[in-house]
Amino acid sequence: YLFIKNNTADYGGGVYARYEGEPVFNHVTVIENTAGQGGGMRFRDNANPIISNCTIKWNISSGAGGGIYCNNADPEISYTSIIANVANEGGDAVYLKINCEANFMNTTFVSNGSPESDTSSAVFCVTNCSALFTNAILWGNLGPEIEFSSTSNPNFVTVNYSDLEDGQNGIVTNDNGTISWLDGNINENPLFCNSWDWDFSLAEDSPCVGTGIAGNNMGAFDVGCGPMMSINDDLPTQFSLKQNYPNPFNPTTTIEYSL
């Protein structure tokens, strides 16, 4: 296990890889790093990362790509959580700039973005990029879950067996790309065990349990707690207040109230 923490750079606060190669990250936590581009990680020019079982959390970019910034790179990301990253110029979790092909398998995107930013989006695609989401959870991020640039070449996104907040409406194409919305997608609260304490494992009764491809779970984490307590919503919808009796009265009376 490796922690990459509290670093500052112009590009790639925690990691910067460039030129041909396939850097592999397994069981790595990239946390609380800061950069001008790619607060957590930055990849470009065919540095195609393989990222699995990782946590990318609380990173900040003063430019684009709070968690991960890719330019002409093809990331493969699986069983990874991308949590509470912030970028001032889009792509709070992931920013795909030019000619990127991204594959997200069992990845959890949650709480990315800042209320102080008017460019928030969890995943932002600029030009000629494609992104495939399988068994993914995109929930509780500020701004669109996925957004395309409105001014560059078209982008393409495929979503299957994933939980995406607001469903297809959570994807903003700006009339500049295509959505392939395949089987198995849902728009339901994933029922994280304790998001207040940054625990994004799934409750036993989460709609993401067993509903991914081949009966797998959605997201980066397995079941981590029992079922959530259900709230009884069988509340009264009508009431009546009857005439008091006797009427007139002195000194007492009875008023009947029923639900």
Predicted features, each with a name:
Residues 232-245, 249-259:
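Glycine-centered coil/turn sites that cap beta-strands in beta-rich domains
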Residues 1-4, 17, 23-34, 41-199:
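Predominantly extracellular beta-rich ligand-binding scaffolds that present long acidic/polar faces
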Residues 183, 189, 197-199, 215-218, ...:
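Generic secondary-structure boundary/loop-capping signal
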Residues 193, 209, 242:
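Nucleotide phosphate-binding site architecture
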Residues 186, 212, 240-242:
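Residue-level marker of motif borders
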Residues 196-230:
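Surface beta-loop-beta hairpin patches that serve as ligand-binding interfaces in beta-rich domains
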